[in-house]
């Protein structure tokens, strides 16, 4: 199951992403890469994009294994289908969702 951390994140992910997460986590995957293409495209090198879903040890999170020890490429997922357009659409949806949460809080 995906562990989501923004209001409406699961629905946004399901709507825009073509690839699964790495056990609910994101790093250099379609999701993060799309967001970076939207906000700071000069930092993204799509020619280096590779799919990698490293084996996740059953003790991950309960021992001292760092996320950096598990992936050869640094990728956890598949950044290849990432686009600036997806990132922009997700950012727009995040903004709408968090605005609704803030409006509820100030009522």
Regions found by a protein language model. Give the residues of each.
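Extended, histidine- and acidic-residue-enriched regions that form the cofactor-binding/catalytic faces
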Residues: 1-107
